[in-house]
């Protein structure tokens, strides 16, 4: 530990093909990222959110509405669910992702730089604390518990039925 006196040797290599000489912005090809078969929940974190119309609205066999009402309500349910989800994700996904990123970065930093050094320090000090605690237990708590146990061992109860 101390001051580093060696110079770091850093080099940057760039191909002429990958470096653009004009000052305009280059955007990624959106068709490359628009894979509709992509599984966006590979660990099935939100498998409980797969709700259909029948999971929310159900009519028993004895009471049915008109078929047209059922079909229209089903279509309206699916359309409104789709549109509202898209609308909410447009306005909430980026800010919430930003907030979650800040939160996870903060928690990671606290865990790495505060919590784990504290735990490691406690584990280093623990053997000496364990020795002191064992001495206190042997000197104070063990004789007290033994005395109380002997006092209560002489108590006897007898039940009689009158």
Curated annotation (Swiss-Prot):
Topological domains annotated Cytoplasmic: 1-86, 108-162
Residues that bear Phosphoserine: 20, 23, 36
Keyword tags: Cell membrane, Cytoplasm, Golgi apparatus, Membrane, Nucleus, Phosphoprotein
Compartments reported by the entry: Nucleus; Cytoplasm; Golgi apparatus membrane; Cell membrane
InterPro entries cross-referenced by the UniProt entry: Caveolin (IPR001612), Caveolin_CS (IPR018361)
Documented effect of changing residue 27 to A: Greatly reduced Src-mediated phosphorylation and binding of RASA1, SRC and NCK1. Completely eliminates Src-mediated phosphorylation and binding of RASA1, SRC and NCK1
Recorded topology in the membrane: Peripheral membrane protein
Top-level division of the source organism's lineage: Eukaryota
Any single GO BP term: vesicle organization
Keyword Acetylation belongs to the record: no
GO cellular component: acrosomal membrane; caveola; caveolar macromolecular signaling complex; cytoplasmic vesicle; focal adhesion; Golgi apparatus; Golgi membrane; membrane raft
Result after altering residue 36 to A: Abolishes phosphorylation
In-chain residues carrying the UniProt-annotated modification Phosphotyrosine: 19, 27
Post-translational modification comment from the UniProt entry: Phosphorylated on serine and tyrosine residues. CAV1 promotes phosphorylation on Ser-23 which then targets the complex to the plasma membrane, lipid rafts and caveolae. Phosphorylation on Ser-36 appears to modulate mitosis in endothelial cells. Phosphorylation on both Tyr-19 and Tyr-27 is required for insulin-induced 'Ser-727' phosphorylation of STAT3 and its activation. Phosphorylation on Tyr-19 is required for insulin-induced phosphorylation of MAPK1 and DNA binding of STAT3. Tyrosine phosphorylation is induced by both EGF and insulin.
Tissue: Expressed in endothelial cells, smooth muscle cells, skeletal myoblasts and fibroblasts.
Predominant location category: nucleus
Intramembrane runs of residues: 87-107
PANTHER family reported in the protein's UniProt record: CAVEOLIN (PTHR10844), CAVEOLIN-2 (PTHR10844:SF3)
Family recorded in the similarity comment: Belongs to the caveolin family.
Subunit structure comment from the entry: Monomer or homodimer. Interacts with CAV1; the interaction forms a stable heterooligomeric complex that is required for targeting to lipid rafts and for caveolae formation. Tyrosine phosphorylated forms do not form heterooligomers with the Tyr-19-phosphorylated form existing as a monomer or dimer, and the Tyr-27-form as a monomer only. Interacts (tyrosine phosphorylated form) with the SH2 domain-containing proteins, RASA1, NCK1 and SRC. Interacts (tyrosine phosphorylated form) with INSR, the interaction (Tyr-27-phosphorylated form) is increased on insulin stimulation.
Function: May act as a scaffolding protein within caveolar membranes. Interacts directly with G-protein alpha subunits and can functionally regulate their activity. Acts as an accessory protein in conjunction with CAV1 in targeting to lipid rafts and driving caveolae formation. The Ser-36 phosphorylated form has a role in modulating mitosis in endothelial cells. Positive regulator of cellular mitogenesis of the MAPK signaling pathway. Required for the insulin-stimulated nuclear translocation and activation of MAPK1 and STAT3, and the subsequent regulation of cell cycle progression.
Protein name in UniProt: Caveolin-2
Native organism taxonomy: Eukaryota, Metazoa, Chordata, Craniata, Vertebrata
């Amino acid at each position: 530990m101390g001051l580093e006196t060696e110079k770091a040797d850093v080099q940057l290599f760039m191909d002429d093909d990958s470096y653009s000489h004009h000052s305009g912005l280059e955007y990624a090809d959106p068709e490359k990222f628009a894979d509709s078969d992509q599984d966006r929940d590979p660990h099935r974190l939100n498998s409980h959110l797969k709700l259909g119309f029948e999971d929310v609205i159900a009519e028993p066999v004895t009471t049915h509405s008109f078929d047209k009402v059922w079909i229209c309500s089903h279509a309206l349910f699916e359309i409104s669910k789709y549109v509202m989800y898209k609308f909410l994700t447009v306005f909430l996904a980026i800010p919430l992702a930003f907030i979650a990123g800040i939160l996870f970065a903060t928690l990671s930093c606290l865990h790495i730089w505060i919590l784990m050094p504290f735990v490691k320090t406690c584990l280093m000090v623990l053997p000496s604390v364990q020795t002191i605690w064992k001495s206190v237990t042997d000197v104070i708590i063990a004789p007290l518990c033994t005395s109380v146990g002997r006092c209560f061992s002489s108590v006897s109860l007898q039940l009689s039925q009158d």
